[in-house]
Amino acid sequence: MAEVSMGSSSSSTDLSPEEERVFIRDIAIAAEANSKEGDTFYLITQRWWQEWIEYVNQDQPCNTNDGSSLSEHCDSPGSSTLKKPSRIDNSDLIYDSSLEDPSNTSEIIETLQEGRDYVLLPQEVWNQLRSWYGGGPTLARRVISSGLSQTELAVEVYPLRLQLLLMPKSDHSAIRISKKETIRELHRRACEIFDLDSEHVRIWDYYGHQKYSLMNDLDKTLDDANLQMDQDILVEVLDINGTLSSAHIQSAQENGLVDGDSTSILIEPSKSSLAAAGGFSSSRNAFRTGSVEVSQSFDNTYSSTGVTTRGSTAGLTGLLNLGNTCFMNSAIQCLVHTPEFASYFQEDYHQEINWQNPLGMVGELALAFGDLLRKLWAPGRTPIAPRPFKAKLARFAPQFSGYNQHDSQELLAFLLDGLHEDLNRVKHKPYINSRDADGRPDEEVADEFWKNHIARNDSIIVDVCQGQYKSTLVCPICNKVSVTFDPFMYLSLPLQFNTTRAITVTVFSCDKTALPSTITVNVSKQGRCRDLIQALTNACSLKQSEELKLAEIRNNFIHRLFEDPLIPLSSIKDDDHLAAYKLSKSSENTTLLRLVLRRRDQKAGERESTVQLKPCGTPLLSSASCGDALTKGKIHCLVQNMLSPFRREESVGKKGNSDSSIPERRSARFNNTEEEDKVGGLKKAKKSNSSDLGASKLSLQLIDEDNKTINLPDNEAEAMKLPSSATVTIYLDWTPELSGMYDITCLESLPEVLKYGPTTKKARSEPLSLYACLEAFLREEPLVPDEMWFCPQCNERRQASKKLDLWRLPEVLVIHLKRFSYSRSMKHKLETFVNFPIHDLDLTKYVANKNLSQPQLYELYALTNHYGGMGSGHYTAHIKLLDDSRWYNFDDSHISHINEDDVKSGAAYVLFYRRKSDAGGKMT
């Protein structure tokens, strides 16, 4: 490996790709080793980072989506010679990229996922890359401490955004502040923003527009105060007597900030201990309340979900989404509606809390879950805000802190394990030395293993959810057989791997009479841009004289052209909008012409002179030779040719009515279908006659690549040559007259690369059986090389074959469908539709213990669903209430009836089955 030593001032143009890689690798290693609280990290778009990684590596593809460290990627071999990356462009990470925020507080898009959308770089690495490549905007974020011991470090990508409401002036302001700042700092900043005297100001936790608690513990952090993203903070200004004046109260009443018969007073804490949010305490001080001042009416501050039910059915209370917490809400609802847990946590379970268990959370997690369960089963339909529970969860599992989307199954696994340890009836776990089977009967060995397990693990979670499987290992050399019987909490079943993905592209033709069409093609998930272009070429029957230019459309502009055929398709997101333009094959001296439409954006009351022109619709693309002499009239003809497919019928054009409501306009929308589909309703245009609209009627502005204006000749016949730049942007001001002649409704929005929705009938016609998934899970297979077994007879590690069998099944069987797949080169989600039984899941033949006399039958009562892609999307739950035998959809705070036929879908993720009773086949 070549050693490189140079100052930070070195230009990247002086370095080879290998030297850049080594230089950044060494900086990254040093920075990661010395990271500490208070350091600054910087977000960089995953797309640019991926380009740079591939540029500086030489042997094979490299992808950063594997969770490994930054320095590891700088040691990953790459592939063929690639084009040097252009300027860093982080515009896809923020809402408004028109201006760079000099304070480095640009609003980052809320749904970003690390490793999918961005990479975090230490300050030293960011500074070096930016000095080489330039660009931005700069997105700096602080390192904070997290976890129970506050020793785990994390980058606070999304600081709290709080809405400050000033009473009585009814002013408001939004601020960003770290959750590690104190209430004192929040108080100071509120006074600074509203220009207030701090001695006469107090602030309230005003979550849900109710006074939840007075924030008077100035040294408490905002994290400890359980503040949530985008919640309200009430800022009260008091008079010299410490109260609001009558005039102020009247003003506040008019704005709904206080009740009509009240003044601003301290709200009394809840008198209920166990029913309040974190109100239990013991002589051991094992449970510390998070907030003392709790409003009695807090849980009644939200409107009903509107569910109409028979009688007074309980259990139909929703959970408010605190910001990407649907993953948590769906899992909680399934556990809460498990009958055994509902009964247990509504009774006095506190005597079973294990206060000394070092593997537990000293009872805090169990208490928080039990309190939440009681509220969800209480009478009424008012949605609950699970703030106290989320705070406890984040404290003991920092990976679930913040407001990023997480895996619902990972949350479920942690929660079940945490509840088990908090409720473990075994106070002192004995040491047990497990014996080998040594040829003994399976029944004897299985019972021995189970008794040993129960001697250390005995809780309601074990009683309800844990089963036992038989694991058989066979040495391939000496044939030594090792049999163990291990407990399981859930079964993670593999799904068939799909190596392709569907990508939808809108194709624009160079034929002046052809309308745009949407085409969906299947390509390899690990493919390159050239593979997508080839698939589109085949699908749209491209002529020999034509070529496709593929582009990503964003904010009514061509955000990027996919000119490099080696760009990985993984850089194309499912919610991107792609366009492909059919053009005549170009020579080296061809200039691309981008036609961008822009419309006057006049707001109410705005003066005519200040009205701005804003881009609209989808850009169009054409080409022209740099050597051709073009007149102003020819340029206008080029523009009219690009617009000709959207020309209205002559009768409509003559009327010039821009507000036409003909059916053709109303139906001119793209449909995301599985085959080529012409835009409905628009008539194919007749051959365009450029004389229909004189050149003087088109308002054009030409801009070159350097953002410099290209002056058009005043004389229409005077010839000009296009500059040698690769692209020229033509801005066309869209006028009412043009609207009367052309219908560009279909250009207003393009379909996304992949639209998620209910499973199609085609997908349902050939489903994957849940039994097939189970058989794949139980199938004998060799261990992977990284997990080789130590054979006691050979006294060496061997790649043994492993066979799993079910032996003991739990009362509640949780089945996880492994939709998310991870590898070093990629992450992806499997959209496979799995046909799972609802009423009679029969596992009898899969249980190796043949001494069981009863059939092993289960009935589905709950499941979680995931809609969307990796690291994003949305979770819901389908749950059957056993007391009324009806199915409901739990979508955060909204609950609605669903038919049993709608329970199955391609979104099903975690299934909850309950054992049927012996008599009658019904669940107990």
Swiss-Prot record:
Q: What is its EC number?
A: 3.4.19.12
Extract the Gene3D superfamilies matched here: Cysteine proteinases (3.90.70.10), DUSP-like (3.30.2230.10), Phosphatidylinositol 3-kinase Catalytic Subunit, Chain A, domain 1 (3.10.20.90)
Q: Where is the composition biased (Polar residues)?
A: 64-83
* Enzymatic reactions: Thiol-dependent hydrolysis of ester, thioester, amide, peptide and isopeptide bonds formed by the C-terminal Gly of ubiquitin (a 76-residue protein attached to proteins as an intracellular targeting signal)
- Which GO annotations describe the biological process of this protein? protein deubiquitination; ubiquitin-dependent protein catabolic process
User: Which keywords label this protein?
Assistant: Hydrolase, Protease, Thiol protease, Ubl conjugation pathway
Region (Disordered) residue ranges read: 64-87, 648-690
List the biased-composition ranges (Basic and acidic residues).
648-667
Under Gene Ontology molecular function, one entry of this record is: cysteine-type deubiquitinase activity
Give every USP domain span.
317-916
An example of a Gene Ontology cellular component annotation for this protein is: nucleus
Occurrences of domain DUSP (ranges):
15-145
Highest taxon of source = Eukaryota
Function (record text): Recognizes and hydrolyzes the peptide bond at the C-terminal Gly of ubiquitin. Involved in the processing of poly-ubiquitin precursors as well as that of ubiquitinated proteins.
The UniProt family comment states: Belongs to the peptidase C19 family.
Q: What is this protein called?
A: Ubiquitin carboxyl-terminal hydrolase 5
